Regions:
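Substrate-recognition/cap regions that form aromatic- and gly/pro-loop-enriched pockets
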Residues: 217-341
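Conserved small/polar residues in nucleotide/adenosyl-binding loops
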Residues: 345-352
Length: 352
């Protein structure tokens, strides 16, 4: 049986388009089985982006169930580790793909009665990781609503569109900013009740501010202590930028450029709310040795992740005082990367 990482590796090795990758994964799952938990993947090439989801076929079956939806060219799709695919119009081959057993397994397992309209997420997932019977969580809602406020999406809905057309064009910097989101200044801000009184040195008056020690990445012990002192002090919300993240990336696929420079992965390690991103071109064949060393499960000075992690953990201690410095450094490195990327791309384009 395949795990999701193995399927990803084989698809990347053997396929040149997103559609080819989806078909190959489907064939491998049908023949050899899928033994991992439910997963969703974004599978993209320079011309298309697809949202792909896969589940096992059952405890006594070697196989799997999967479905895929193409994100329209002018849309943005979001899935944060939950099933998002709803109805499947398999007659529309330009937009939808699915395993042959997608409906039969749902009926056999009692997930769908065959009478009500079939919804993939409802049959194979039933809800999000908070136990809510929804095809989204706060993360999907926040991003989709931020990009298309004109749609007036409701958090009380059972499901949201798998993708939306943004109210204005989305740049790579916009995606980076969304991946840094902690809901600061919104109703979901986990630090909004963590206030302290401070005396203004100039006016001698007392102001109430968010505590410098407050941060959106507080652990369970801290949250339990604060809520133990006063119930309801902090409502835990799943952030877009989570501190347990090992790495994240924003990938640009530009079909008007040669492959070697048309693809760029903007990579960062550790907490995406604090870490700057660096550009890695698809034509890159080598990186500094520290990038090839795994420091995920233990401290290693020679692993790049620990350079990020150390700075982030220290900054978090008094985030209210260090936030501006960290954000300024992130902006500096990302702006430097963006300007140098544009220059490098122009330098490497063939001349006529």
């Amino acid at each position: 049986m395949f795990m999701i990482e193995e399927l990803e590796k084989i698809a990347l090795q053997r396929c040149t388009t997103a559609r080819e990758a989806i078909r190959l994964i489907g064939q491998l799952v049908a023949e050899y089985g899928y033994g991992d938990s439910g997963e969703c993947l974004t599978i993209a090439d320079p011309n298309e982006v697809w949202h792909f989801e896969v589940f096992g076929e059952g405890p006594d079956k070697i196989g799997g169930v999967w479905a895929a939806v193409r994100i329209p060219d002018d849309h943005v799709g979001v899935s944060a580790n939950i099933s998002r695919i709803s109805t499947l119009d398999l007659k529309d081959k330009d937009r939808y793909m699915a395993s042959e057993n997608v409906f039969s397994v749902a009926k056999k397992m009692g997930f769908w009665d065959g009478k009500e309209p079939f919804k993939f997420w409802k049959a194979y997932s039933g809800g999000n990781y908070f136990g809510e019977p929804k095809a989204f969580s706060i993360r999907e809602y926040f991003i989709l609503n931020a990009l298309a406020p004109s749609l007036k999406l409701s958090y009380d809905s059972e499901e949201l569109p798998i993708s939306v057309k943004p109210d204005k064009p989305v740049a790579v910097t916009d995606v980076m900013a969304l991946l840094r989101q902690t809901y600061e200044g919104t109703e979901w801000d986990m630090t909004k009740n963590l206030k302290v009184a401070v005396k203004n040195k100039e006016t001698k008056e007392t102001d109430t501010i968010t505590s410098p020690a407050a941060n959106p990445w507080m652990g369970t012990d801290m949250l339990n202590m604060l809520n133990g002192v006063k119930e309801g002090t902090v409502t835990r919300n799943r952030l877009v930028a989570v501190p347990q993240c090992s790495y994240s990336h924003v990938i640009q696929l530009r079909n008007w450029l040669p492959d070697a420079v048309g693809g760029v992965a903007w990579l960062s390690f550790d907490n995406p709310g604090q870490s700057p991103r660096i550009p890695i071109f698809s034509g890159t064949t080598d990186l500094p040795a520290a990038f090839g060393i795994c420091g995920q499960h233990r401290h290693r000075e020679d692993a790049i992740v620990w350079k990020y992690r150390t700075a982030n953990k220290l900054a978090t201690v008094r985030w209210g005082l260090t936030k501006e410095k960290i954000n300024g450094a992130v902006a500096h490195f990302e702006e430097k990367g963006l300007s140098e990327t544009v220059s490098y791309t122009h330098l490497t384009l063939p001349t006529t």
